[in-house]
Amino acid sequence: MDGRTRMQIDFAHQPPSRVGIEWELACVDRGSGELAGVAPEILRSFPHDDAHPHVTGEFLTNTVEVVSAPHSRVGHAVDDLARLIERVVDVADPLGIDLMCAGTHPFSAWPDQDVTPDNERYATLLDRTRWWGRQMMIWGVHVHVGIDDASKALPILNALLVHLPRFQALSASSPFWSGQETGYASNRALMFQQLPTAGLPPDLTTWADYERLVGDMTHVGVIDHHSELRWDIRPAPKWGTLETRVFDGVSTLGEIASLAALVQCLVHDMSAALDRGEELPRMQPWFVRENKWRAARYGMDAIIIQDAAGDEALVGDDTRALVERLSPTADALGCEAELRGILDIVDRGASYQRQLRVAEENDGALAPVVTHLVEELRSGLGR
């Protein structure tokens, strides 16, 4: 890959396969179900520092994000999230605020939402992206998994792109936008990729390719820092991880645990394969693009491209086989129960399917969908 500038980017030391999770949560008014811009008020109860785990704000004032510490076990990271959310709920309850999570809100309108003030990063993003950036009324889950050497980052990233449609379909939770059913399982996926540095990563092979890309993009003014590359899967050099960001926001701790376990097992297996001198699978970029669109459009009904040869399968059938293959790895990592929760999603339906059922049962009314999402989150906390 040619480039005019190569920027050296140090990759932090992180014990391999350690996992950390970020969960974006929407604040909604208990009476109306509308989004409520109360995150700044809630966050005053959580003094900011750089310690983990922590609670923080996001792009919009209707959003609170909880972040786990890195752990070797998925279950311990999820325990962090549960403790943090319990604290957030204790602050939000007296304000008449509930928490929910989905890729999008079923009916609130984006022009009614406020951008978090006094944040230079958000102001710069908004100044550059304008109308599209202003519409980013979306929520997601980010899963970090540690890798022990920067040279593994791009091969593992490319291999994870083979699995991206599974991640997208299993987490899909955004069938509605501004009160309308979109016909997409994940409308968030299509919204987020409108930002110029979001969506699928470019076709890179080595860490040097990545450094040259960052150098070139900095040189021509696309970004000021590599953290502004908001790809669906990206290296996170500061933490020594690969960060899978394609997931729609999901409403239960159990689903988050299952998705995190799936990524952890895959990265662990891929890293071990590289240690054995094996080449990891990858697919043509247009196959990856097509898979993302199919999963965003059809969710668990998507027929996905499985490999570079163009073999296809229904995503649910393909995922069942993958879970069985990863079972020994999950057992070794202590996340077998969490991984098998993926099969529960396949059997009972992803969040978008459950939301659509609730809307249908209520003659198309969407307020009950918000109630359903709030109740799913609370039930996972035992409330």
From Swiss-Prot:
GO BP: modified amino acid biosynthetic process
Catalyzed reactions: L-cysteine + L-glutamate + ATP = gamma-L-glutamyl-L-cysteine + ADP + phosphate + H(+)
Keywords: ATP-binding, Ligase, Nucleotide-binding
A single MF term (Gene Ontology): glutamate-cysteine ligase activity
Pfam families documented for this protein: GCS2
InterPro entries hit by this protein: GCL_type2/YbdK_subfam, GCS2, Gln_synth/guanido_kin_cat_dom, YbdK
Coiled-coil annotated residue ranges, if any: none
EC identifiers of the protein: 6.3.2.2
Tree of life domain: Bacteria
Record keyword Cell membrane present: no
Protein task: ATP-dependent carboxylate-amine ligase which exhibits weak glutamate--cysteine ligase activity.
NCBIfam families: gshA_cyan_rel, PRK13517.1-2, PRK13517.1-3, PRK13517.1-4
PANTHER family: GLUTAMATE--CYSTEINE LIGASE 2-RELATED (PTHR36510:SF1)
Family from the record: Belongs to the glutamate--cysteine ligase type 2 family. YbdK subfamily.
Name of this chain's protein: Putative glutamate--cysteine ligase 2
Lineage: Bacteria, Bacillati, Actinomycetota, Actinomycetes, Micrococcales
